[in-house]
From Swiss-Prot:
The keyword Disulfide bond applies. Residues 386-400 have a biased composition (Low complexity). One of its GO terms (cellular component) is cytoplasm. This is Vitellogenin. Glycans are attached at residues 569, 587, 1357, 1463, 1596. It comes from Bombyx mori (Silk moth). Residues 344-358 have a biased composition (Basic and acidic residues). Disulfide bonds join 1451-1602.
Length: 1782
């Protein structure tokens, strides 16, 4: 009985639900295409297929007869009859059509009777038999969607363009409509059909004209979306159309329907077509297409008088025709109001959209200018919305918080993530078994890298990941236990099984996988570095970052199981905070990166757990570490807090940035750098903070430069950009000026739409930037994005912060953003408090002992420091960090000084371990990028796009070595190591586009796989000795051929069974897309002559290879490299580079490099022509000695450098290649000579050699004069002789000259005029003169003749080949004259340089004709490269050009001016007091040199020099130099503990420890004394009146009148007592009150002491305002000024009278005040209305609401009284009536 009653209730409810749905909306009845009592029969066909632009199509088709019976209004019965289904994968004439011979099979479980509820032509709901599976249900929904025709006003979007004439049945309107693909905006058009419709509907040709209805869906505006997505790149639009500048169209999706229907029914024909276009590799021109077409055509319409079809058992309701993932009905949470026009996709705006809110304010200026109208009781305020930032403003929650499936439980796998099709929610028992089989298979494949591309290792790894992702916690735990035993196995294959499984679990991204990783760490299955590498990958692989998971992850990162493990502790904390940023704080990634369309937002947007739990905990941890002065941990916590990217981190960092909590400059810089994550959200607050720090010139420059690096990420406003451009002119810090210039100029070149605002603002400021040139060592930021409309390779950013104590940067960073990246990807950053100190510390820890100095010097550095009270700067703690974000690993390795001590100990321990033998086995498999997008198409089947970049690193090595450190017995470091290496790196770029045929469980797809693999299987040996490095390499497996490099591209079409365990490439049904002809192919062997055979084999069908050079057109190397791995024209490509070990007779290669220098060589004779050498053996001491002797012949006290390189191929028949070069010159001889020997020694090919000699004579050099070199000719003759073969030789003779034309140009150049002006003031070596002197020693004309004998014809036509080369390169200024010939065997060359025009011209005359290349470009630094100037070398002059004279800086003590190392020039003539030129008493580890240089003038034109120097090797010297008197030489007195070895024209003292000259000095021909201390460590030139010193050491540590050598001119005002502003005070402060000092100088010194002030840093306030200004800004701000509030008057008289204007005192309340008018104001009573209004200015007086009198006055006014008030008045506007009317 109970069952009967229950059945009756259910039937009643069901019938009531159907009967209550009438075919009307809002009382208006709409016609239905379905007439009661009729039966409609349709022919149904459906096809869905995938295809590339060429090649086979893969898909499926469905056909059936569809019968609809209308039994009552709004209720239909329907049934599919004879349903059939077929699959195909073949080449088709039309890729969208079906094969003619397609074979169909019956389709089960779909021919059941089901019911449809309609409202007019709109489908309301469905009832299915429970025996109908969900996949079949979705197919039916796709068919039913095609028949939906709703021309009613239901859910029409209000729009003025909407129109529909029901009588004429024509119109166009937009409405929200639900079909199987989603509830989205649909554009209806209703129109007549062309007369030819009868051909289309021959069976109904006699019926009245039908109407054509078309529908087009806008997927950018949906209230309910059925989709799954994960990992979608930032800015990639796939739901709709990319309209914003920062968006790119990733997927193009469209659904179009066409219906032919009678005016009152029936529907004769309905077609729905869905198309999806996407490039398999995300971006590119050649898109893949998934095409879905549903076709329904009416066969007959009959009267239906039969009984209803009986129900096929129990029924299952479907509340809508949306695609379903389960039988469970998911609730939709959205308003379906017809007036709704908000778009879900519009709710999640990019941060850039709000980055310039003032721009939108400008557009709405008029509305702001309008006066606001409020009542007198209430003041309304308008507030601008905040810019997007953090959790509060990135983007709003969607108005459609729908869900399509339940979020997986912590113990459940992610079913929807696999195919977005219904999955049985139960473990498959075979999963564990299949996973183990695949593990064994791919672990075995990993041992044979040659076959890895063919066996498709990486694709199989992703199959393993899929299996793991489908496991529950229990099943995964069981599987793990069975594999964990292999972890400690000595078997390589078993060990690889564990590591691959470990990485598979990491990449699965499911909650059970996360739980399993936690278990591993807690149970110490993985620890420290191994665990760290697993944990750091989780932020990019976890697919469901719920609040529970994020808090659990964070707490786990702080648990004892993690915190006590090295490497894991910091990595886990950063991974947890990065996940919290992606999943919660950054609302854009929280929506677009994770599957929110499937499950809704995974955490509530306004959940405060980040502010209440996460951030306070990290802030407390940071505070504690700072109090304990633990820099290492502090860096980690700063990085973790920065990772969160929430605006509230500014409050956490504020005390440290404001200086309230004392920390080092390095940590403050670290804080500012870690604001970048917040800056990426374009947060206005952080942008303001960064700009404030930048503008504060009292901040340390590293902090300011770090702010610049981040402010460009936040996209500064136009005003900020213009201010920064102006700062490039006047900012006191050269580092700030340099980085601003480089950043603005590179930002102006950006092309990607996402950088539109940044690029435009930079372009507007570009021309405001300074023309000052900055050195490469200064701070800079370079940004490049290689972009075109269809190809987005990525962004390349390189930046660094310059150092004051080194040319090495304090911070160096490279960032590459890939096209699939959401965060900064592939980031490498090294940061130091001082790079120089860091390297010195490491070096000293191993090599350098502290020297002891026994002898006291007259003026040692220590004594001078005491005399002048010079105190070394208080050194900040030594801190450093290395940050790497690579292979999905975000790692921070931070160091303090104590850590460096442990590091040196670790290195020592590792060396000891290596001596006994060390083995390493490492395997890492990961997905560098992965993107998944799935949604249904018209047929009711899910479209699936998956992009992955799986990669593997496999490394096995054995290392054994021996190390010898310097000792008493051996002064040199020696090492000998042997290492066996098997290294494999492989990556696939795998994009797959298709759909899941849910009827046959067949996955039809097309795709492209790019494969790249490197394999290094070699045994290496290295030997290091004094001056010798020997490197040996041999095959690890000499009996096997090895594939060293593999590259291939495979476009394919496939049809696979769902959950197939076979890789697509190995499936027999897969078809490769091929073309008819190859574009390029190679099949060649190289290296036969060396018996080491390299085989290059391959081919390509891609047109990209027709012009391979086009891939190298970008400004940066990263883009050029990335372009090699991508194809614009996708086509089959396959290349291999192999080492054929079996065919190679050479079994090993030994490379030897030897370098040595010989000093004071005295050999009589002259350099003769080149002759053959007798000794051709590698590394021959005999040959080197012979060549040293020959090259030094005739050179007085020659210094000879020798380089000996050799390569020996060892085997059954050795093959040796040798290259030996020697170079001889002398500081006291003008001759320069060189020799070169190149030879081969082969048992099969015999011995061959080429010998060459070179000789030139340097021109006369004038080191300190610009005018003297111009008065004499500059000429340097040279000659060369080459000998080759039996009788072949080449002889070259020519000269370098300076022409009169160039001399005249130089004399008239502005630089020369500046120098002349300085020279008249007795200043010969200021900046302008230095540059002019260098240019005066540069030749501008080179002319030489080449005569040859027995030269091959191809070399004789050199001029012709050179001409053709330049012509090919695009130099249009080339010309040839084949009639002007030289005699046979001779060629003439002329080269003319025009340095000021930056061009050069080449003339070549040869026996084959004359060629001339005119006005070709030349580098600006050419004069320095070609200059003969000494004592600087050519490479130093070039380096100085690129570093602003900071590579080899100089200081000159001139006649009346001093030029400092940092290029400051100031007026100061020396007095007879000793002045400190340089003083450095370095106590830094690794830098134990002590230096003091003093200078004074006893007479006006005579300067005396004193030098004290102590080296780290324990050698010391004192030099006292006095000017020459009359014709006598300079008086040089040297006191040293080293031995003098020469004492005539070149005096030399020898350092026995370093085996090199300790001191050299000589007088040059121009009368200048040249001094060289410790082999160019310090160089000086002196002519009795002026003294110039060159050195690149002592940066930022030296003191004296030559400045700090920091590169900052502002530092050259610092004296021992502080900063002074006058140059005479600065120089006098470094004078000594010794030896008859000058009284005037001492007076200046005393004055400097009085006026000196100490520099101090003043830190920046972080968004801080005083209360008064804050209050004033609220009441007097721009909004109030532009939109003054207008108050509306009213009468409070309660007695109704005639409607006339009454006078009434008014009041209003504003904030905490009561304001009352001082006079009565016109008003109307409440029962009257104003006839007209006017604005009247009225005086008001305001007092606090707490004021008793004003509260009383307010009550009186409300009673209609008019009290009189007094006080300070202000004027306000009131809207008052002119007349009052009833």
């Amino acid at each position: 009985m109970k069952l009967f009653v229950l059945a009756a209730i259910i039937a009643a409810v069901s019938s009531d639900r159907f009967s209550s749905q009438s075919q009307s909306t809002g009382g208006q009845t709409y016609p239905s295409p379905w007439q009661v009592g009729k039966q409609y029969r349709y022919e149904v066909t459906s096809r869905t297929l995938a295809h590339l632009q060429e090649g086979p199509s893969s898909g499926s088709a469905f056909k059936a007869q569809f019968t609809i019976r209308v039994k009552s209004p709004g209720r239909l019965q329907a049934k599919l009859e004879n349903p059939q289904h077929g699959n195909f994968n073949e080449q088709l004439p039309d890729p969208r059509e079906l094969p003619v011979d397609l074979k169909y099979q019956p389709t089960p479980n779909i021919d059941k009777v089901f019911e449809i509820e309609i409202d007019g032509g709109r489908i309301v709901s469905l009832d299915f038999p429970t025996s109908v599976p969900v996949p079949q249900e979705n197919l039916i929904k796709g068919l039913i969607s095609a028949l939906q025709l709703d021309t009613s006003a239901h859910r029409v979007i209000h729009d003025s363009q909407n129109n529909y004439d029901r009588e004429q049945q024509q119109g166009l309107f937009r409405k929200m409509e639900t079909d199987v693909t989603g509830d989205c905006e649909t554009l209806y058009t209703v129109s007549p059909v062309a007369s030819e419709w009868r051909r289309e509907l021959p069976k109904f040709a006699n019926e009245q004209d039908p109407v054509e209805v078309t529908k087009s869906t806008n997927y950018g505006h949906c209230h309910h979306r059925v989709a799954y997505h994960f990992g979608v790149p930032v800015g990639a639009e796939w739901t709709g159309t990319a309209h914003k500048t920062q968006e790119q169209q990733l997927i193009g999706r469209a659904t179009y329907s066409r219906i032919l229907t009678g005016k009152e029914g029936p529907i004769y024909k309905a077609e729905t077509t869905s198309t999806v276009h996407v490039h398999p590799h995300l971006y590119g021109k050649q898109k893949a297409e998934v095409y879905s077409h549903v076709h329904m055509e009416l066969i007959s319409v009959d009267q239906d008088s039969g009984a209803e079809w009986p129900r096929a058992g129990a029924m299952r309701p479907a509340q809508s025709i949306l695609y379903s993932l389960s039988t469970k009905q998911m609730t939709k949470h959205y308003e379906s109001s017809s007036s709704s026009s908000s778009s879900e996709s519009h709710e999640f705006n990019f941060p850039e959209q709000h980055e310039h809110p003032h721009q939108s304010n400008q557009r709405s200026r008029r509305s702001y200018m309008r006066s606001k109208l409020v009542t007198v009781h209430k003041v309304l305020k308008k507030r601008n919305s905040e810019s997007s930032s953090g959790s509060s403003s990135s983007s709003a929650d969607s108005s459609s918080t729908y869900i399509n499936d339940d979020i997986p439980d912590i113990d459940e796998p992610a079913y929807a993530a696999l195919y977005m099709s219904p999955q049985p929610h139960a473990d498959k028992k075979q999963n564990a078994m299949n996973a183990q089989k695949i593990l064994q298979d791919i672990a075995q494949q990993l041992q044979n890298p040659n076959n890895m591309p063919k066996s498709d290792f990486l694709s199989k790894f992703n199959i393993l990941v899929r299996l793991i992702a489908s496991m529950s916690t229990e099943q995964l735990s069981q599987t793990s236990r069975s594999i964990e035993t292999a972890k400690t196995s000595n078997n390589i294959i078993k060990s690889d099984m564990w590591m691959i499984f470990r990485d598979g679990v990491t990449q699965a991204g499911t909650l059970p996988a996360f739980k399993q990783i936690q278990s591993w760490i807690e149970n110490k299955k993985i620890q420290e570095e191994e665990a760290a590498q697993v944990v750091v990958a989780l932020p990019r692989t976890l697919r469901y970052p719920t609040k529970q998971i994020m808090t659990q992850f964070f707490n786990f990162a702080r648990s004892p199981a993690v915190k006590d493990q090295m490497f894991l502790n910091s990595s886990a904390l950063m991974a947890a905070t990065k996940l919290i940023n992606l999943g919660q704080v950054n609302n854009y990634t929280a929506h677009s990166y994770y599957p929110t369309h499937m499950y809704g937002r995974l955490t509530h947007k306004h959940d405060a757990f980040v502010l209440e739990e996460i951030l306070p905990t990290l802030a407390a941890d940071l505070k504690a570490t700072v109090e304990y002065k633990d820099s290492t941990k502090a860096q980690v916590y700063i990085q973790a807090i920065g990772n969160l990217g929430h605006r509230e981190i500014l409050k956490v960092f504020a005390p440290y940035l404001e200086g309230k909590v004392e920390i080092s400059t390095y940590l403050r810089t670290h804080i500012v750098k870690n604001l970048k994550t917040l800056a990426k959200l374009r947060d206005r607050h952080v942008r303001a903070v960064l700009f404030s720090i930048l503008r504060n010139t009292a901040e340390p420059y590293p902090v300011r430069v770090a702010a610049i690096q981040s402010i460009f990420i936040s996209h500064p406003t136009g005003e900020m950009m213009q201010a920064m451009a102006e700062m490039t002119h006047n900012d006191p810090s050269v580092e700030v000026r340099a980085v601003l210039k480089s950043a603005i100029l590179s930002a102006a070149e950006l092309q990607h739409p996402r950088n539109f605002y940044l690029s435009r603002t930079a372009q507007a400021a570009r021309y405001l930037v300074t023309n000052e040139e900055f050195g490469y060592q200064h701070s800079f930021k370079f940004i490049d994005d290689s972009y075109d409309e269809d190809n987005d390779i990525g962004t390349f950013v390189i930046s660094h912060i310059g150092s004051e104590d080194s040319l090495l940067p304090k911070d160096f960073k490279i960032v590459t953003n890939s096209k699939g990246g959401a965060w900064e990807r592939n980031t490498i950053e090294a940061s130091f408090s001082s790079a120089e100190r860091f390297l010195d510390y490491l070096r000293d820890s191993v090599f350098a002992p502290h020297p002891k100095f026994d002898r006291a010097h007259k003026y040692s550095a220590e004594k001078i420091a005491k005399l002048l009270n010079i105190k070394n700067d208080e050194e900040e703690p030594l801190e450093a960090s290395f940050y790497v974000d690579f292979m999905n690993n975000q790692r921070l390795f931070s160091f303090s000084e104590s850590d460096l001590q442990q590091l040196s100990q670790y290195i020592s321990e590792y060396m000891k371990k290596v001596e006994s033998g060390a083995e390493k086995h490492y395997t890492k498999v990961y997905n560098q990028d992965q993107v998944s997008i799935m949604f249904p198409v018209a047929s009711g089947m899910p479209f699936i796009f998956k992009y992955k970049e799986p990669a593997v690193i496999h490394f096995q090595s054995k290392l054994k070595g021996k190390f010898s450190f310097p000792s008493k017995d051996n002064k040199y470091y020696e090492a000998n190591m042997i290492k066996d290496v098997q290294f494999t790196y492989a990556i696939n770029i795998d994009g797959n586009v298709g759909f899941m045929d849910t009827l046959s469980n067949q996955y039809s797809s097309v795709g492209v796989v790019n494969k790249l693999q490197f394999n290094i299987p070699f045994k290496f040996g290295i030997e290091i000795k004094s001056g010798l490095i020997k490197f040996r390499v041999e095959p690890l497996h000499p009996d096997q051929d090895q594939t060293l490099v593999h590259y291939s591209v495979w476009p394919y079409s496939a049809s696979q069974k769902k959950d197939s365990l076979v890789a697509i490439s190995q499936d027999p049904a897969t078809k490769i897309v091929e073309r008819r002809s190859k574009v390029f192919s190679v099949d060649s062997k190289y290296g036969q002559s060396t018996h080491a055979v390299i085989y290059a084999q391959g081919y390509t069908y891609s047109s990209d290879w027709r012009n391979f050079g086009a891939k190298f057109t970008s400004r940066d190397y990263f883009t050029n490299l990335a372009s090699l791995l991508t194809q614009e024209d996708i086509a089959l490509t396959h290349f291999n580079l192999k080492h054929l070990c079996k065919q190679s007779q050479s079994k090993a290669l030994t490379i030897t490099a030897y370098y040595d220098e010989y000093y004071n060589q005295q050999n009589s004779g002259i350099l003769t022509d080149a002759t053959d050498r007798n000794d051709l053996s590698p590394n021959s001491e005999t040959r080197r000695a012979e060549m040293v002797k020959l090259v030094s012949a005739g050179i007085n006290k020659a210094r000879v450098r020798v380089v000996d390189l050799s390569a020996s191929f060892e085997g059954s028949q050795d093959q040796n290649y040798v290259l030996t070069g020697t170079w001889g010159d002398s500081p006291v001889d003008s001759k320069v000579q060189g020799m070169l020997f190149a030879g081969t020694k082969s048992a099969t090919q015999g011995n061959q050699q080429i010998n060459a000699v070179f000789a030139t004579t340097k021109p006369e050099i004038h080191s300190l004069s610009f005018s003297k070199p111009l008065q004499s000719d500059l000429r340097a003759p040279f000659g060369m002789h080459f000998k080759y073969g039996q009788s072949g030789e080449i002889r070259v003779s020519g000269s370098f000259d300076r022409t009169k034309k160039y001399t005249t140009e130089l004399e008239n150049h502005p630089l020369a005029k500046q120098c002349s002006q300085q020279t008249t003031l007795n200043n010969f070596y200021q900046d302008s003169c230095h540059k002019a002197i260098v240019m005066a020693h540069a030749p501008d004309h080179v002319e030489f003749s080449v005569s040859f004998q027995d030269m091959s014809p191809q070399y004789r036509n050199f001029s012709y080949h050179t001409y053709r080369l330049y012509e090919y390169l695009g130099y249009w200024y080339t010309e040839a004259n084949p009639l002007k010939l030289t005699q046979n065997g001779k060629m003439d060359f002329k080269i003319d340089f025009s340095y000021f025009d930056r061009t050069y011209t080449v003339d070549i005359a040869s026996p084959s004709g004359e060629a001339r290349m005119r006005d070709m470009p030349i580098a600006t630094m050419a004069p320095g490269a070609l200059s003969f100037y000494q004592p600087l070398k050519a490479y130093e002059l070039v380096a100085n050009y690129f570093t602003g004279h900071q590579y080899q800086p100089y200081c000159s003590i001139d006649g009346t001016r001093i030029h400092t190392f940092s290029n400051r020039s100031y007026e100061y003539p020396l007095s007879r007091s000793w002045h400190v030129v340089m003083q450095d008493e370095s106590t830094q580890r690794g830098n134990w040199h002590e230096l003091a240089i003093l200078s004074r003038r006893q007479q006006r034109d005579q300067q005396e020099i004193y030098i004290s120097y102590k080296s780290e090797s324990g050698q010391d010297l004192e030099i006292e130099i006095q000017p020459a008197s009359g014709d006598s030489a300079y008086q040089v007195k040297v006191t040293t503990n080293t031995k003098k070895i020469t004492d005539d024209d070149l005096t030399m003292y020898w350092d026995d420890v370093k085996e090199q000259p300790f001191l050299q000095y000589h007088t040059h021909k121009d009368g200048v004394l040249v001094i060289n201390i410790e082999d160019d460590r310090i160089r000086a030139i002196y002519d009795g009146q002026r003294f110039v010193v060159f050195t690149q050491d002592y940066r930022n540590s030296t003191r004296g009148i030559c400045g700090r050598m920091s590169g900052e001119q502002r530092d050259d005002y610092l004296t021992p007592e502080g900063l002074v502003d006058k140059p005479e005070l600065y120089a006098a402060a470094y004078s000594l009150n010794e030896e008859n000092s000058d009284p005037k100088t001492q007076e200046l010194k005393a004055l400097a002491t009085q006026q000196a002030y100490y520099p101090e840093y003043k830190y920046t306030s972080i968004l801080r305002s005083d209360p008064t200004w804050q209050e004033e800004s609220q009441s007097c701000g721009e909004d109030q000024w532009q939109s003054e509030t207008v108050y509306k008057s009213r009468s409070y008289d309660k007695h109704k009278g005639a409607c006339e204007v009454r006078q009434q005192v008014q009041f209003y309340e504003n904030h905490g005040d009561i304001c009352i008018t001082t006079s009565r104001v016109p008003s109307c009573q409440s029962h009257c209305r104003a006839g007209d209004y006017k604005i009247q200015h009225v005086q008001v007086t305001c007092k606090s609401k707490l004021d008793h009198d004003f509260r009383m006055y307010k009550e009186q006014i409300k009673k209609g009284q008019n009290p009189e008030v007094s006080g300070i008045p202000s004027v306000k506007q009131f809207k008052v009536p002119v007349t009052c009317q009833p």
